[in-house]
Design a protein with these regions (language model features):
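Helix-to-loop junction immediately C-terminal to a conserved catalytic motif
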Residues: 53
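A short, flexible loop at the N-terminus of ABC-type nucleotide-binding domains that lies
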Residues: 1-6, 11-24, 73-77
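Glycine/charge-rich catalytic "coupling/switch" loops of P-loop NTPases
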Residues: 249-312, 337-372
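The feature captures the beta-strand-to-loop junction immediately N-terminal to the Walker
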Residues: 38-40
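Conserved coupling/switch loops of ABC nucleotide-binding domains, chiefly the family-specific signature
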Residues: 59-62, 211
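ABC ATPase nucleotide-binding domains
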Residues: 83-85, 89, 93, 98-231
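Conserved ABC transporter NBD signature motif
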Residues: 61-72
């Protein structure tokens, strides 16, 4: 039975003329699964987490846990009766309690503390049990917050951007350990993050949100291979969105050249309608191409209609910003492609690369013959 199931969830805060913060969210968390809620600031992911936790009452829809209804607009079960653990980005530890007392805080009086001791050892804190939060590093405090959340053996732990206040090395180490810790504890998890790399790296599935709408909930591989909307491709992959013109039944043109239908089957959205989350209709019926930054090749050309506007060094490659056709594109190129700002150039789709056409959701590739 699903630890968490969200059905038709709508929510808005009680202020004058408030817009909907969540719009028709459907989501199901499977046992032992870690699901990421991914999206830009203000998209509603933390609100959704708070509704699951019981800190907010939904305006419409329902939250169910293990088949039991815990929240509707008329009926609401308080957080302490839902059997969930919470981990916040600011740790929320009790400053006057030691690491041991913080870990045991959620246990019932007289409850066995052996699990708390096991968790502290699992998280590498067994020698720090007598220290207070101010005597711990940021990474140690977040480990302690996780131990406290897991000590009562919740079926679900909810994590609200738990790594955002940590330095890079500690953040990478902790996030890589999280799935194994949850697995050892037999606990499912919901992770809020605005970092696509973080969500793709550790989550079993990722729910991509924008303006209160769930665009797609799928495995990381499916999000990369078959994004359900231009927004998913843009936010998750940092892909380029290009206008495209259709010519007849099987030819298209864009600023990267002439295109034809790819021989690769059209990608299938994973999850089906039950996980679509009320995906809104496209803002326009105009076709648009989703193009990976690594799928575009650049050639210096004094007569070219594109211009290098800037670049960022990414260690093993450059990320170029190129203006073409009145818009800015992102290109990922190897380090030997050394072009300065102001360089005139021509752009083309790399041979053998595929791009995704919306709203049709079919794959296109470079045409074998130029359009006549």
């Amino acid at each position: 039975m699903a630890p968490v199931e969200v059905k038709g969830l709508w929510h808005r805060y009680r202020s004058a003329n408030a817009d909907w913060t969540l719009q028709g969210i459907d989501l199901c968390l499977q046992p032992g699964e870690l699901v990421g809620l991914l999206g830009p600031s203000g998209c509603g992911k933390t609100t959704l987490l708070r509704l699951i936790a019981g800190f907010e009452v939904p305006s419409l829809g329902e939250v169910r846990m293990h088949g039991q209804s815990v929240a509707t607009a008329q009926r609401w079960l308080p957080p302490e009766r839902r059997g969930v653990g919470m981990v916040f980005q600011d740790y929320a530890l009790f400053p006057h309690l030691t690491a041991w007392d913080n870990t045991c805080f959620g246990l019932r009086r007289g409850q066995d503390t052996s699990r708390a001791a096991w968790l502290l050892e699992l998280l590498g804190l067994e020698r720090l049990t007598k220290r207070y939060p101010h005597e711990l590093s940021g990474g140690q405090r977040q480990r302690l917050a996780l131990a406290r959340a897991l000590a009562p053996a919740p079926a679900v732990v909810l994590l609200d951007e738990p790594f955002s206040n940590l330095d890079v090395e500690v953040r990478l180490r902790l996030r890589s350990e999280l799935p194994a810790v949850l697995n050892r504890c037999g606990t499912s998890g919901v992770l809020v993050t605005h970092d696509p790399g973080e969500a793709l790296a550790i989550c079993d599935r990722v729910a991509v949100m924008q303006d209160g709408v769930l665009h797609q909930c799928a495995s990381p591989r499916t999000l990369v291979d078959a994004p359900a909307s231009p927004f998913v491709g843009r936010f998750v992959l940092q892909a380029n969105l290009l206008p495209v013109q259709r010519h007849g039944s099987d030819r298209w043109t864009c600023l990267l050249g002439a295109l034809q239908r790819s021989k690769i089957p059209s990608p299938r959205v994973e999850g089906g309608d039950a996980e679509a989350g009320g995906l809104p209709p496209a803002a326009s019926d105009d076709p648009v191409l989703l193009v990976d930054p690594a799928a575009i090749e650049l050639s210096p050309d004094q007569q070219g209609d594109a211009c290098v506007m800037g670049r960022e060094f990414l260690g093993r490659e450059w990320l170029y910003r190129v203006e073409a056709g009145g818009q800015q594109l992102r290109l990922r190129l190897p380090l030997h492609h050394d072009y300065r700002r102001g360089t005139r150039c021509s752009l083309a789709l790399r041979s053998g690369e595929d791009v995704l056409l919306f709203p049709d959701r079919i794959g296109l590739t470079l045409a074998a013959q130029p359009l006549q």
